[in-house]
């Protein structure tokens, strides 16, 4: 896509997703067995033929770098790149202080590539979006800035930027994370919220970033500072995400913020529904990632009974013997011994589960080893003495943990 530069904000610490983010940045957290969270933003860009992309990182980014090197390397293709960019303190000895500051500290990339438009997207949501449709809207409106937005219950909107628009799609109000979100006129209980995805006219973006960087009282954030300053000037528009159409799909648009353990678990359960609202199987919108060279998953009966796999996803290299797996996602190289009963659980890969284990609503991080006969998620009071248990009763086993030994 000529004249367009993509910049993906991938520096999120992800504190609400701990312990899954203890050793990795939030965009590097595995999802859906085969993917990382960053993959969904990257696929939205690549499937829209937007192939000049900088991925701005900051915290604990090594696993993200490794994933991108293996799965997203387009070196050698003229004028196409997907480059991770670590925080380099180009404008002083300081980390990124906000989302706008992250772009400002890398403004040289905008200046050197000289695009007409800059797409700035987040990297920690699960959704599909044909960015070309949002860009067409942005160009048609001749906007300085276009913000993508969706409707959600007002009771859930206080963690987002809440938007007001006129009949032409122009932004006429914006409040970042309000305690009492305003509802859409005529739609009681429903608010219009920012998805954290922006398309800027490049010259306007650079102008606003330079101005904001000089303000000592600014938090240097798009939602808190840039958007509230720009929209009263009258050239900020709002793109309705519900109008976005993905080839090969007839369902309503799907968007999920996976910033908490509960929402992360729920998004996985969405994948396993009979009529899943988010499909991994659309050939017209392929979901690229790094897939290691592994043999197919193997299922075998044992002396303890037949293997049963019900409403589940199982990735390559996995070996399951005589156990029952229901409504669960098993990542690469999951090794499940016989007589186990695993339900509504997520194994992130290279996990060993010994004979006769019971797992209920458990997230097991990579490399964990669970001893035979262990029960997790059955007695939450006991689990809380040893592991992180969310308010909703989801148990999280940390990366590399040896359980029950």
Curated annotation (Swiss-Prot):
Enzyme class: transferase
InterPro entries: ADP-Glc_PPase, ADP_Glu_pyroP_CS, GlgC_bac, GlmU/GlgC-like_hexapep, NTP_transferase_dom, Nucleotide-diphossugar_trans, Trimer_LpxA-like_sf
Enzyme Commission code: 2.7.7.27
GO biological process, one term: glycogen biosynthetic process
Positions contributing to alpha-D-glucose 1-phosphate binding: 96, 161, 176-177, 194
Coiled-coil zones: none
Gene3D superfamilies per UniProt: Hexapeptide repeat proteins (2.160.10.10), Spore Coat Polysaccharide Biosynthesis Protein SpsA, Chain A (3.90.550.10)
Pfam families: Hexapep_GlmU, NTP_transferase
NCBIfam families (alphabetical): glgC, PRK00725.1, PRK00844.1
UniProt-listed PANTHER family: GLUCOSE-1-PHOSPHATE ADENYLYLTRANSFERASE, GLUCOSE-1-PHOSPHATE ADENYLYLTRANSFERASE-RELATED
Annotated function: Involved in the biosynthesis of ADP-glucose, a building block required for the elongation reactions to produce glycogen. Catalyzes the reaction between ATP and alpha-D-glucose 1-phosphate (G1P) to produce pyrophosphate and ADP-Glc.
Family in the record: Belongs to the bacterial/plant glucose-1-phosphate adenylyltransferase family.
Subunit structure: Homotetramer.
Protein name: Glucose-1-phosphate adenylyltransferase
Biological classification of the source: Bacteria, Pseudomonadati, Pseudomonadota, Gammaproteobacteria, Vibrionales
Encoding gene (name): glgC
């Amino acid at each position: 896509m000529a004249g367009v530069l993509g910049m993906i904000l991938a520096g999120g610490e992800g504190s609400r997703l701990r312990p899954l983010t203890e050793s990795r940045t939030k965009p590097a957290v595995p999802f859906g067995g085969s993917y990382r969270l960053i993959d969904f933003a990257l696929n939205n860009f690549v499937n829209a033929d937007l192939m000049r992309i900088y991925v701005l990182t900051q915290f604990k980014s090594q696993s993200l770098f490794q994933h991108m090197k293996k799965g997203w390397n387009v070196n050698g293709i003229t004028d196409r790149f997907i480059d991770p960019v670590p925080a380099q303190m180009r404008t002083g000895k300081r980390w990124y202080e906000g989302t706008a500051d992250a772009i400002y500290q890398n403004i040289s990339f905008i200046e050197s590539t000289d695009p007409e438009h800059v797409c700035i997207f987040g990297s920690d949501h699960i959704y599909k979006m044909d960015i070309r449709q949002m860009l067409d809207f942005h160009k048609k409106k001749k906007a300085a800035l276009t913000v993508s937005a969706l409707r959600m219950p007002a009771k859930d909107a206080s963690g987002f930027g809440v938007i007001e628009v006129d009949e032409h799609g122009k932004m006429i109000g914006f409040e970042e994370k309000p305690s009492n979100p305003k509802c859409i006129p005529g739609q009681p209980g429903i608010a219009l919220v920012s998805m954290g995805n922006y398309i800027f006219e490049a010259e306007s973006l650079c102008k606003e970033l330079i101005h904001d960087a000089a303000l000592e009282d600014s938090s240097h954030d798009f939602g808190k500072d840039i958007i509230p300053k720009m929209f009263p000037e009258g050239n900020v528009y709002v793109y309705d995400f519900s109008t976005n159409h993905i080839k090969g799909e007839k369902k309503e648009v799907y968007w999920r913020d996976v910033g908490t353990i509960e929402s992360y678990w729920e998004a996985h359960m969405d994948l396993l529904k009979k009529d899943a609202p988010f499909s991994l199987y659309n050939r017209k919108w392929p979901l690229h990632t790094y897939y290691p060279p592994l043999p197919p998953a193997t299922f075998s009966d044992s002396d303890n009974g037949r293997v049963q796999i019900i409403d589940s996803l199982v990735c390559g290299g996995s070996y399951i013997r005589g156990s029952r797996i229901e409504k669960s996602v098993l990542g690469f190289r999951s090794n499940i011994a016989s007589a186990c009963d695993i339900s509504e659980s997520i194994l992130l890969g290279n996990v060993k589960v010994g004979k006769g284990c019971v797992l209920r609503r458990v997230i097991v991080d990579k490399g964990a080893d669970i001893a035979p006969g262990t029960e997790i998620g059955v007695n939450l009071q006991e689990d809380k003495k040893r592991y992180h248990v969310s308010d909703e009763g989801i148990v999280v086993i940390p990366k590399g943990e040896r359980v029950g030994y």
